[in-house]
């Protein structure tokens, strides 16, 4: 592990993610996180005051990482892309980058429901901020797509910001009953395609 404080902090958060996924929030202790990280419990406390702060910091870390990946997808600048993507493909990929990491925790961890509840109670402000930031990015993408003639917002009688909100909320609702990531991806891609077809 690097001696950089930032790298140590991220290593602790990654270890916390593993422990929370394995045992849930309530059963995980600071000692568990320290052991998973490979450092002393005292070292953990030099970065975080308590488990609650670890949890909030982890939530912020995961949201920031998801938003960063979503931004790359919206721009279509992934290294694997060999040709420009249509706006529907970029938006669908960005939505999946934003919502799928959290959906995977819910569906793949035995403690997914508990973690989702804790996140809602302890990190609601972080969730709202992340949603607003993503919708702002999506609004910019839709505005650019309209300017470039890829979509026509006037056809749908929507402003870019309203369309962005509907797309995000609609895609988020598709998590309901999606038992795995493949199901969610299929739903999101179909939803975005149908939604944007109404703007052509």
Give each language-model segment a name.
Residues 22-26, 105, 148-149:
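Short coil/turn segments at alpha/beta junctions that flank glycine-rich nucleotide-binding fingerprints
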Residues 1-7, 77:
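N-terminal intrinsically disordered/low-complexity leader segments
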Residues 57, 71-104, 164:
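Hydrophobic alpha-helical connector segments
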Residues 89, 93-139:
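Short secondary-structure transition hinges
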Residues 8-16, 33, 58-62, 66-70, ...:
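Generic hydrophobic, amphipathic alpha-helix propensity
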Residues 13, 88, 92, 96, ...:
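An amphipathic alpha-helix signature
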Residues 11, 15, 19, 23-53, ...:
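Helix-turn-helix
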Residues 109-113, 117, 124, 128, ...:
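Hydrophobic/aromatic-rich alpha-helical bundle segments in the mid-to-C-terminal region
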């Amino acid at each position: 592990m690097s001696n950089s404080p930032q790298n140590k902090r991220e290593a602790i958060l990654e270890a916390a993610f593993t422990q929370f996924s394995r045992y849930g929030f309530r059963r995980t202790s600071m000692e568990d996180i320290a052991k998973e990280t490979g450092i002393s419990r005292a070292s953990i406390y030099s970065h975080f005051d308590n488990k609650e702060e670890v949890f909030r910091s982890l939530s912020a870390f995961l949201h920031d990482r998801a938003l960063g990946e979503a931004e790359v997808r919206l721009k279509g600048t992934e290294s694997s892309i060999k040709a420009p993507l249509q706006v529907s493909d970029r938006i669908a990929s960005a939505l999946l980058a934003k919502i799928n990491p959290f959906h995977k925790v819910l569906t793949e961890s035995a403690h997914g429901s508990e973690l989702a509840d804790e996140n809602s109670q302890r990190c609601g402000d972080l969730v709202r901020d992340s949603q607003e930031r993503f919708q702002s990015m999506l609004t910019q993408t839709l505005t650019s797509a309209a300017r470039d003639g890829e979509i026509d917002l006037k056809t749908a009688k929507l402003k870019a910001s309203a369309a962005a909100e509907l797309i995000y909320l609609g895609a988020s609702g598709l998590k309901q009953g999606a038992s795995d990531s493949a199901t969610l991806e299929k739903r999101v891609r179909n939803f975005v395609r149908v939604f944007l077809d109404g703007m052509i």
